[in-house]
Amino acid sequence: STEIWVLRTLNTIYVSADTGKATVLVSLDFSAAFDTIDHSILLKRVQMMFGVTGTALKWLQSYLLNRQQSVRSGHAMSSPTSCATGVPQGSVLGPILFSCYTSPISKIASAFGTDLQQYADDTQIYIALSSADMTSQLQALENCLASLNVWFSQNGLSLNGDKSEAILFGTQQRLRTLPNLDGIRIADSSICLSDSITTLGLTVDRNLTFNRHVANVVKSMHYHTRALRYIRPALTDEMAQSVAVALVQSRLDYANSLLFNTSVSNTRKLQSMQNQLARTVLWRSVDQSSTQLLKQLHWLPVICRMKYKIGLITHNVLNTGQPAYLRSLLTHYQPTRTLRSADQHLLTVPNLKTEFARRAFSFVSPTTWNDIPLEIRQLSSVNTFKSQLKTHYFSLI
């Protein structure tokens, strides 16, 4: 999921910051990425690199080749034209095929000592900067981007340097000690460093406060809550709750595991909006207890929702081993002597020095998991775990 994808990137940034490093990240933008994929290269790549053969390969060929498209304007329609390149956008296969097509770029990135994260055409390159080697590390990043640009050109993709973004992450103290960077060179362009970037619907600032993201979520929730208030008299309680969950609560829950340990101010803003939403759904006045309204709707408060999401992700990672990267961050606690805690299904909490780094998944996950009662932690059934974990957090309200 997009949330897991961002969790991985931010975990690396947080842990690097704990060792006194800043991280520079470049978010790449492609021009018409899905429309320029070469069919012959794609088919060869899925066959040679991913083992797609036989009937599956023939099906994929029929899906890609001899596809036609027309343009309608009013009552007029153009003649059908064959699509020599590209994969259909908005399809389930589109992002998967794009990822298969660009899979070789991970080796290019690793050859220069940089990290690469890719979710369909959302591609990010980043590298941790140490004071002693900053110049050589920035040069390695630019060399990597130059090599990637050559690869993109050879494979029919066009990198848009003007729309690509760069940002430098780190603690406020660390960023203040760094020299000013002129920018990152890419595709004959120089990208100036931004204070924040938006990726996959998440606005991320250089200090990872998520203030701008929370402000955007609050603004969106306020707009939709007000719209719901106008039509509330025409809805039943059940209909109002369904609309609220689909249009408003979903915005509160999106990537909320990343907001754990955000500022008290941000948490209060989100909680205030959830309280307003609950009053709108149940048609109650402001003097009603918001806690009781949330219980009546069976909605967990904001902080509990964050813990609940982290618990679900951790349970899934421990029981399935996937995604492998997150699984590698979690270690079962093994006491040096035979103690009762040896069979408590506990996780080892890493020793991170800074509060900034303690927002990393590798720290937040085990601390949240270890606080869950043993009888819930040891459940293997996903549905039973979800139900009992939610009941547990409700008992704490």
Please provide the spans of the model-predicted regions.
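Hydrophobic/basic alpha-helical segments
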Residues: S1-I397
